[in-house]
Amino acid sequence: MKRIAFLTPYKHLPNFKKNVESKYKCLDLSDLTELEQKYSIQTSDYLFSAPNYQKFQITDDFIKNTKISMVVSPSTGTNHIDVSIPVISIKNDKVLENIWSTAEHNLYLMLSLPRNTKNIVELHEKALGILGYGRLGKMIEHICKPIFKNVYTSDINYTDSQFFNETDFLSINVDLRDENIGMIDSEYISKFQK
């Protein structure tokens, strides 16, 4: 039976856990340090890693002298993985259309922001700007429209006319690729009126 080393938690997903444990020998290494994980993956065939729990980048050095032939990540980005072996990512997969956890986490962070400032604000009086209007941006718009006074969007080929004038909170949902690095700089921030 093939072995999967889980560098990040997976047991909180009962259906996934049941399915994967019926097909593979699963090693839960999520509570170990990076060094302990590196030592423990020696006999595994695959690695599983979710970026929101991982505190380091998986590199060729990390998997050197192991049997690891593939890295699996339940994520749309792979900036936490830099290896020469195959990486399976679910970016643009239809299964993502019904997974709202990242959008909900984004909302949670937005809800916590006003509570961590000296000036308490009510979101129903504020405008949300969504930078990046792909799958995640559309989900955020859907769950935030009932909460914010207005929601404005901006993407590669379109920006709402009031986006820079009215945005109080900015949700950044662009993918990590070379052309987006440095996109949010002082010049970009200076476009906002509030």
Regions picked out by a protein language model, each given a short descriptive name:
Residues P146-D160:
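NAD(P)-binding Rossmann-fold cofactor-contacting core
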Residues L113-I140:
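Glycine-rich NAD(P)-binding loop of Rossmann-like domains
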Residues I143-C144, F192:
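Aromatic pocket-lining residues of Rossmann-like dinucleotide-binding sites
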Residues M1-Y46, N150:
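N-terminal glycine-/charge-rich "phosphate-binding" loop or analogous flexible N-terminal tail
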Residues D45-K118:
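Phosphate/diphosphate ligand-binding glycine-rich loop within oxidoreductases
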Residues K55-F62, I156-K194:
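Rossmann-like adenosine-cofactor binding region
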Residues M1, H124-A127, K194:
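Phosphate-coordination loops involved in phosphoryl transfer and adenosine-cofactor binding
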Residues S40-Y46, T66-S69, N165-L170, Q193-K194:
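Short acidic/histidine-rich motifs immediately flanking catalytic phosphotransfer sites
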